Structures are given as structure tokens and as C-alpha cells.
Amino acid sequence: MRASFDTNILVYAVDRAEERKHSLAVEVIGWASRADCIFTVQALGEFFNVVTRKTGLDLAEAEGFIDDWRSVFPVASATPNCLTSAIQAVHHHGLTYWDAMLWATARDA
């Protein structure tokens, strides 16, 4: 089964405010680099928004993290079919829309 990450894991990987979460996120991303894992455009975009607006990370530094991850992981974009699948997952499984979209994008990648 292919894995992907919610934005929070990516944020914790660069934000040292909560050291335990930071360490775990770095460890998990390291594991993922040796597994069948993708990143989504959605998660990378949300990461950029959060770390530059809420943690004060410099724009270039945030872009550097994204570039580094893109060199290691395939990056998938949502499709119209992902939209349909995400909406169905909200209806049938109670997921939030954005979590459902991450799931659908990773599944279809």
C-alpha cells in the first residue's frame, strides 16, 4: 500500500517547537524515503503556507524543503476522479474533505 503524509507531519519535520513531534516526523519521513511513499501537491502547498505564515520560516528556506522532498519522493496531483472519490469518502467514511482528498490522490497515484 502506498503511503502519503498529512501536512502536519511535514510541518513538524521542520519546526522544532515541539521536539518530540519534530524527531518523530523526521524519523517517519526518513523511513518513507525507503518505502512506497508519495507527496501530494496539496500537502506541499499547505506546508508552504503554514510554515511561512505561522512559524515564520523564510520563503526560500520553505521552498528549499519542498525542493529537497521533491528530489526524493514522487509528487502527485489531484484529478477530477480524486474529487469524486474524496466526496464519496466524506459521505461513506466520515473523513474531512481535505483528508479524503489526500487519501484519494495517494490512492490514484
Each model region followed by its residue ranges:
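Short beta-strand scaffold positions
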Residues: 5, 39-41, 77, 97
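Amphipathic alpha-helical segments within well-ordered protein domains
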Residues: 48-49, 70, 87
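Structured helix-beta-strand junction loops
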Residues: 32-35, 71-72, 93
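Active-site neighborhoods of divalent-metal-dependent phosphate/nucleic-acid chemistry enzymes
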Residues: 74-109
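Short glycine/serine- and small hydrophobic-enriched flexible loop segments
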Residues: 49-53, 107
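Short, well-structured N-terminal submotif of metal-dependent ribonuclease cores
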Residues: 1-39, 54-67
